[in-house]
Curated annotation (Swiss-Prot):
The keyword Transmembrane does not apply. It catalyses: meso-2,6-diaminopimelate + NADP(+) + H2O = (S)-2-amino-6-oxoheptanedioate + NH4(+) + NADPH + H(+). Homodimer. This is Meso-diaminopimelate D-dehydrogenase. Keywords: Amino-acid biosynthesis, Diaminopimelate biosynthesis, Lysine biosynthesis, NADP, Oxidoreductase. One of its GO terms (molecular function) is diaminopimelate dehydrogenase activity. Optimum temperature is 65 degrees Celsius. Thermostable. No activity is lost after 30 minutes incubation at temperatures below 60 degrees Celsius, while half of the activity is lost after 30 minutes incubation at 65 degrees Celsius. Probably plays a role in lysine biosynthesis. Pathway: Amino-acid biosynthesis; L-lysine biosynthesis via DAP pathway; DL-2,6-diaminopimelate from (S)-tetrahydrodipicolinate: step 1/1. InterPro entries: DapB_N, Diaminopimelate_DH_Ddh, Meso-DAP_DH_C, NAD(P)-bd_dom_sf. Optimum pH is about 10.5. No activity is lost after 30 minutes incubation at pHs between 5.0 and 11.0. Substrate binds at D94, D124, W148, Q154, G155, T173, R199, H249, N276. GO terms for biological process: diaminopimelate biosynthetic process; lysine biosynthetic process via diaminopimelate.
Length: 326
C-alpha cells in the first residue's frame, strides 16, 4: 500500500514535532519541508528536501497532505487559505475568538480547489473541544469548565515576541486553584475568565526598548491578555534560556452536571504534557490521515475536529477497531 505523502510548512517547534511524529506512523512519509527562511540555513533530521515556501505550489501533485506549522497570530491567517488552494491541509489555528472567520476563509479556498482542510487541530482547540462537546451531550443540564496549565502557551509566547522591542518571551498559563476546587466539588460556580486563570510572562527586551510600553501592549492585547490578570517580568536572555526553555503544558475539561433526580455527575478529561509542541504535532499527523481519506472519498472544504469520525484517524481497519478497541 502506498504511503501518505506529507509536506511541512514551517520548521519551528511544531514543524520539528511533525517530522518526529511521522517517524512513528509507518503509513506516512515526509516528502519535503518548506520554509520562509533561506533553505540552506535549515537543517532537518530527515533525509528530505528543504525548499522555500514559494516553491510549494510546484509540489501539489507530490504531496497528499500539507501540514501548516506557522503561528496563529499572523502566519496561518494568510497561509491557511493560500495552501488550501493547492493541497489538503492541516493546521493548529488556536485563536478561539477568530476560528469562525478563519474557517470561512479557508473553506472558501478549499471548496473552490476541491481540497480538504482540517483547521484548529491539536489539544485546545482539538481534543479539549471534543470533550467539551461530549460533556454537553451526555450531561445536557450542567456547566463546562476548561482549565489550562500550568504550562507554556506557544501561541501567547509567539504573540508577545511579535511586539516591537521584544527580543524573546515565554508565557505561562496558570489555573487558579480555588476555581478548580469549586468546580470539582460539583458547586457549578459562575466563573469569569479572570477568575479561572492568570498569565505570567517572562520577557527579554531589545536594547533601548521601553519596558512600560511593552508591558502595556502585552496586558491590553485583545484575544490574548486583556481579560486576564497578567504579570510581566523583564529578564535577561541567559535567565530565559536557563529557567524557561522547556515547553510543558496540560490542563483539563470538566463537565459538571446533574442527571435524573438530581444526581451529581462529573466528567473530567486531563492532559499532562512534557512537550506541548510534540503532543500537538502528533495530533496534526493523525488528522492528516483523516484528511487524506476524506479527500480520497471525494470530500472537500474546511473541517474541524467535530466533523471527523474517530475511525478515520486510525491506521487500523474498521474491523480491527471493532475487535480491539470497542
Amino acid at each position: 500500500m502506498s504511503k501518505i505523502r506529507i509536506g511541512i510548512v514551517g520548521y519551528g517547534n511544531l514543524g520539528r514535532g511533525v517530522e518526529a511524529a511521522i517517524q512513528q506512523n509507518p503509513d506516512m512519509e515526509l516528502v519535503a519541508v518548506f520554509t520562509r527562511r533561506d533553505p540552506k540555513t535549515v537543517a532537518v533530521k530527515s533525509n528530505v528536501k528543504v525548499l522555500h515556501v514559494d516553491d510549494a505550489q510546484s509540489y501539489k501533485d507530490e504531496i497528499d497532505v500539507m501540514i501548516l506549522c506557522g503561528g496563529s497570530a499572523t502566519d496561518l491567517p494568510e497561509q491557511g487559505p493560500y495552501f488550501a488552494q493547492y493541497f489538503n491541509t492541516i493546521d493548529s489555528f488556536d485563536t478561539h475568538a477568530r476560528i469562525p472567520d478563519y474557517f470561512d476563509a479557508v473553506n472558501a479556498a478549499a471548496e473552490q480547489s476541491g481540497k480538504v482542510a482540517i483547521i484548529s487541530v491539536g489539544w485546545d482547540p482539538g481534543l479539549f473541544s471534543l470533550n467539551r462537546l461530549l460533556g454537553e451531550v451526555v450531561l445536557p443540564v450542567g456547566n463546562t469548565y476548561t482549565f489550562w496549565g500550568k504550562g507554556v502557551s506557544q501561541g501567547h509566547s509567539d504573540a508577545i515576541r511579535r511586539i516591537q522591542g521584544v527580543k524573546n518571551a515565554v508565557q505561562y498559563t496558570i489555573p487558579i486553584d480555588e476555581a478548580v476546587n469549586r468546580v470539582r466539588s460539583g458547586e457549578n460556580p459562575e466563573l469569569s475568565t479572570r477568575e479561572k486563570h492568570a498569565r505570567e510572562c517572562f520577557v527579554v527586551l531589545e536594547e533601548g526598548a521601553d519596558p512600560a510600553k511593552v508591558e502595556h501592549e502585552i496586558k491590553t492585547m485583545p484575544n490574548y491578555f486583556d481579560e486576564y490578570d497578567t504579570t510581566v517580568h523583564f529578564i535577561s536572555e541567559e535567565e530565559l534560556k536557563q529557567n524557561h526553555s522547556g515547553m510543558p503544558h496540560g490542563g483539563f475539561v470538566i463537565r459538571s452536571g446533574k442527571s435524573d433526580e438530581g444526581h451529581k455527575q462529573i466528567i473530567e478529561f486531563s492532559l499532562n504534557l512534557e512537550s506541548n509542541p510534540m503532543f500537538t504535532s502528533s495530533a496534526l499527523v493523525a488528522y492528516a490521515r483523516a484528511a487524506y481519506r476524506l479527500s480520497q472519498n471525494g470530500d472537500k472544504g474546511a473541517k474541524t475536529v467535530f466533523d471527523i469520525p474517530f475511525g478515520l484517524l486510525s491506521p487500523k481497519s474498521p474491523e480491527d477497531l471493532r475487535k480491539e478497541l470497542l
